Every structure is written in C-alpha cells, then in structure tokens.
Amino acid sequence: MSKLKLSSTNATAWCGISQHSLMDLPWVQELHFTHLKIAITIDRMFPVMPSGPIPAQPGDTLYLSNLDDMIGARVFTPTIYFYEPAADMNSSQKPVMKILCDSLAEVLVAYYPLSGRLRETKNGKLEVFFGLNQGVLMVEAHSKMALADLGDLTVPNPGWEPLIFKFPDEEPYKVLDMPLVIAQVTLFSCGGFSLGLRLCHCICDGLGAMQLFRAWAATAKAGTKIAKPEPCWEREIFLPRNPPLVKFPHVEFMSIEDGSSLTMTLWQTKPVQKCYRLSQEFQSHLKTLAQPDDVCTTFDAMAAHIWRSWVKALDVRPLDYELRLTFSVNARQKLHNPPLKEGFYGNVVCVACATSTVSELVNGQISDTTRVVREARLNVSEEYLRSTVDYIEAVRPKRLEFGGKLTITQWTRFSIYESADFGWGRPVYAGPIDLTPTPQVCVILPAGKADQHGTVVVCICLPEDAIDKFTEYLCMMDSSNASHI
C-alpha cells in the first residue's frame, strides 16, 4: 500500500500549517488488492421459505411503484460481508448455516414480498407475484483457503466474485423470475466465513435494505424474531397522477448524443478498478475550500472534486461538451403529503443531475462545481419526486443512458457495518467488490469496522493510462490556484 500525500507546497499554501506536520499525514492512500483466484465448492442450494403464515397466496400480486420500477433499479445489488473466526468458544461453536437460515426464515414472515418473484404486466410494468416453491435462494459453500489468503479484506477486490452466487449463463440485468434475495455462505478453513448477497433493487433502496438486514442480523443474534420497525409495503403511496403531471425536464433519464471523446476513452480497453482511502482531514479541508460563498455538504465537495479529477484525467474533448453527474438523493424527509410510515422499505430515492461543460470543470473553480452539485441535490423535493413518478409513467425509459455521464453512489450514509452483527461481531469488510462492469460509476464507502474517524474509500474504474493522472488530481489541493483542483 503506497501512501499518497499532498505536496508540502500545495498543502502549506492553503492549510497554513507547517510542512513537517503535513509530510507525515497520509491524507490520501492509494489502495492495492491482491490478484487471486478463489477455489470454492458449492455443497448445496435450497430455498428458504417464511417460517410461518404470510398474507399472500399463490396467484396473488403486489404493486410496485414507478420508483421501484425505474430502469436503474432493475438490477441486483451485490455485496460481500467477511466475518473473522470467533475469538470466544461460545461463538465459535455456533452453527453458521443453521442460524442464518433459521433467522432468515423468521424474518421472511414480516418481509414476505422478498419470497416472491418479479414479472412484467402487459404494459411492461413490474409487479411481485407469488407462486409455489419460491422463497429466497440460499447457497452453502466451502473453501480450503483461509481468510488470510484473500489479501487485504478492507479493499474491494474483484477476485472475490466466486463468493457471490450467479447462475451459470445468467443474463446481465436479469430480474424476472429470479429469487429476489440470493445468499451464499462460504465457510473458510480458518473458521471464518463470508456472506455474499444479491438483493433485487426493485424491492428496496439502500436504507430499506439496511432495515431488512438489521432485522435479519438482530434475529440471528437474539435467537428470536426481531423486526423493528414493523416493515411497511404500501407502494401505492407513489401512484402516478392521472393524467401524469411532469413539471421538470428530468435530464437524468434522457438520451444525449455522446459527441465527446468520453465513451471511446472509457471503453476502448478494459477498465481497471482503483480505490483510494481519504482521511476525514482531507474531506474537511476540501469542504472548506469548496464553499467560500455557499454552505455545502461534504458530499457536495467530494462529488465535485471527484467529477473534476475524472474529467481532467480522461482529457475529455471538446471543451464545450456538456457532461452530467448523477447521484441518488434520499427523499424520505421531504415527503409530507402524506409522510412515509415508519418501516417503509421501498425505493424513495430520486436521481439528481448536475450539468457542466468540460471547460467549466477543467478551468473553473472547485466552488463553482460544488455549487452546481449542491443545487442539483437541493432541487430534489416532494414535487420533484412526484414528477419523477409521472415521468416514468408517461415515458417508461427502457435503458440506462450513459452518454457524458458519471454516477456517484454514496454508501457512507448506510449503517452497513453496524447492521451486520449476526452474533459473530461486525464484519471486517462490508460492501461491493467489482465496479468494472460499470466504468462510469464511482462508489464512496465507509472505510471499515476499525475506522472511527470518518475516513472513506473512493472506488472508481479508469482506463489504465488515466490512473496516474486521476491519482494526481485527486490528491491535489492548492488554494492559490483553484483551477488545479
């Protein structure tokens, strides 16, 4: 692992502190993962059904809102959780598979929609339907390797892919007639284990997934069902208006002709996943520099800085081409008519979209880009959400649009480590593993269970010949020449 520090000249120029103290401060670390092949044996696969009666019979259906049915939600979100061998004798003797399966079956009584399947109606809209022999898919596997053989477990590694189950020859983005939750438990020779999950985004957003996961983990740990808050389905709260009333342009969904060099640069070779650890001090100073006029959030400043660094590293042309930055905004607290019920676990996110020309990103100031990001975030209101629902109803976009776009996803607002203690302690790592299938996506992750200082990990995919430039721009901070950052 190589530590990247701001140059003493740049750092001193705007921080106003001594060169000596900064030279010892690892504000940005470039993280490296071990290239490995994990050999596993799948021992068995079986459905996990709700352990008690549920309010649905074969043939019943459940409504999904247009927020659940957005084209970007028609995916499975893969995550991996690593648990080290238990230190105490009582925990080490707990049967992992039995506890995880029994507790999941208990939780599925309250979260019964997850035991169904998705299908399309005549107009192409998704719904949940219930049939015989459905349930959640559980996969039990083992490996002769130990967790120590997997390299640094704090850095997302594409080599962990065998630990998250996929069907042979599975079609990309397939969600129809699939189990809505797929869980693979892999037992390692050292006594540790991993839990690889694929959860259908149509059923819940990130906060909804954490609610489900928290209930599962708490039930496993306590040995009795715990589902607080009581889960609430009620997707009809987001019914479209009749007729649909679209009040915003919703450029986040629109197809824009890519008249730039961006797509060719990104896709001409297989992208490489890179991760960087950014300290809380780096984020704080970046936020201070980014808001001379406006009050911004740390995310506003970070998103602006990453976007600018990405565009500069890729040397996008022409300079007058307009680029888009999209990111999800949680709209739960913006809903008042009516407010959401506690326990609602469906999708309540809107896609915010900031736009700026290449020239403005490359030659402008960090404060200008931050302001654009902030305005896009604040533009998400209750009416914006209702307009999004109506836009999807009227247009029903069929494909993801990547033209001129970078998407940043923030996982730091999820209590992903705190929610995942099944009785063996918090996971040593919790999060995604491989971003290379989507090279126009950047993910900001919490640094890990051991970090208590606000450190984040930024993961992004880049062409190999752009990595050094991106690393340089990401680390650069100089108030005397704001166009440098």
Residue ranges with predicted function:
Residues S2-S18, L22-Y63, I99:
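Cytosolic, low-complexity regulatory segments enriched in Ser/Pro/Gly with interspersed Lys/Arg
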Residues Q57-N66, F422-Y429:
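Short, polar loop/linker segments at the starts of domains and inter-domain junctions
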Residues G403-S483:
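Low-complexity, glycine/alanine/valine/leucine- and proline-rich hydrophobic stretches
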